[in-house]
Amino acid sequence: MLKNPATKYRSFKPVTLTDRQWPSRTITHPPIWMSTDLRDGNQSLFEPMDAQRKMRMFKTLVQIGFKEIEVAFPSASQTDFNFVRELIEGGHIPDDVTIEVLTQARDDLIERTFESLRGVPRAIVHLYNATAPEFRKIVFNLEKSGVKELAQNAARTMKRIAATMPETQFTFQYSPEVFSGTEIEFAKEVCDAVFDVWQPTPEHKAIVNLPATVEMSTPNIYADQIEWMHRNLARRDSLIISVHPHNDRGTAVAAAELAVMAGADRIEGCLFGNGERTGNVDLVTLALNLYTQGVDPGLDFSNINEVARTAEECTQLPIHPRHPYVGDLVFTAFSGSHQDAIKKGFAVQKPDAVWEVPYMPIDPADLGRTYDSVIRVNSQSGKGGIAYLLEQGYGVVLPRRLQVDFSSAVQRFTDDSGQEVTSAQIWELFQQEYVQNTAPIHYVGHSLSEREGRERIKLTVDIHGTRRVLTGEGNGPLDALMHAIGVPVRIQHYEERALTQGADARAVAVAEMAGADVTGSAFGVGIDANLVTASIRAVISGVNRAYARVNAQAQENFFDAAMNDAAESVGV
């Protein structure tokens, strides 16, 4: 690093705004949320999502409550074009959801973009071109007049083509790319020129998106930029001001929040901050920050673990264990003083009272998470190294969420015994908790066959002491197993690995089960020389643990499908 970085880097020039109003404002209602997970987020992946994963992500976003979703860059690839067509022709877009597509300022690309939208009831078409000095000079070799003319010509093309598609209600959006690095008077000039072409009205507004394509300054400067535009844009009553902060300086969430205070109506971003370089602004953190201030964000993260697993599986990117609200360790206290304060907070917290538990800005239960792992041991406590001991002594590598779950069991054990826990005791406790769960459903045996590309299982089990032979079909052994037992839970996460090597190798499988009536997640572990058998044992163990986590009424009907199955039934 340079001893004098000023010889290489320039500080960002602040906006002249001596009477700024945003510092005295608070956020009392949510902005319009626009997810760009399927476009900006997807294009930043090492391996972009295939059509199946994109559809899964789209449906997850709809389920969360997003009403605007940027789904593709249709002119960039046939894959993106085809995905837009599948959404439209397959009837996947709910009546209250508007899809958005992105296009550069070129006539042929704009035409291709509109072609992808034929037949859609409504859509946002998002036009952009770069306006910052380094892009004008280095990338495009254009003067300011050329940049403005490029944007206006593209706007005219969009307006002309849209007029030939009266069956679709279009909303136009314009982004001066790298707005955060553009001279603010010029950014206004280009935006005004584009909207002079489109002629939005208060009844049919256009969107002006002001992106921090590269985060270049502290969040207060970005807020000043937004407030200046909010005050000075022509046709302000006919525009929705949108922001699109990136996280290059690590302050995208703060920048977005201050931008809303400064006049922004809408925020574009991704779940958990996916996106180019350091990512887009994290919409989950933004929404839950509002929630903890008593403002309904309009997005539902009441099962945040499932959203996280979907995002991880679709993007192939892990979520950091310290990630706000969702990380595996954010509701975990290792410090003794923290543990003491949290215990005391829980002791006095009343169910219907304002949340005031120390060190916990949100109630984990509101997100579908449990209190089981809030206070747990670690190697510094004199009781821990649980995961290390299991891995070193028995070859079992626990997934992080299972580590958190199991540490609660160890904590209870050490609290009851008041003694130091040994490696052998940890292993015995682990088997009791997750491997040896044989009631109310006990695995006896199974056989598998294949028919027309689908797996069929014949499963022998004891349910509440009654032997049953169940059958099921599915895309694989576990899918067939779940169809066979017919319980009201699902496999939320599954993984497997070798426990030992060589001729007597054994496999360990871990299944994380979840269900509408199940409190938290229920883990099951299977260990067997046969990997499929290990996986079946893991799921059945997880089902037994899930059964223990539902109320008495749900338990009465838990195995109805299996008990009423027409398969063979004999007394034990």
Curated annotation (Swiss-Prot):
Q: Cross-referenced PROSITE patterns, in alphabetical order? A: AIPM_HOMOCIT_SYNTH_1, AIPM_HOMOCIT_SYNTH_2, PYR_CT
Which source organism does the UniProt entry give? Paraburkholderia phytofirmans (strain DSM 17436 / LMG 22146 / PsJN) (Burkholderia phytofirmans)
Q: Which PANTHER family match?
A: 2-ISOPROPYLMALATE SYNTHASE, PTHR46911
**Which positions fall inside the Pyruvate carboxyltransferase domain?**
31-305
**GO annotations under biological process?**
L-leucine biosynthetic process
Question: What's the catalysed reaction?
Answer: 3-methyl-2-oxobutanoate + acetyl-CoA + H2O = (2S)-2-isopropylmalate + CoA + H(+)
Q: What is this protein called?
A: 2-isopropylmalate synthase
Localization recorded for this chain is: Cytoplasm
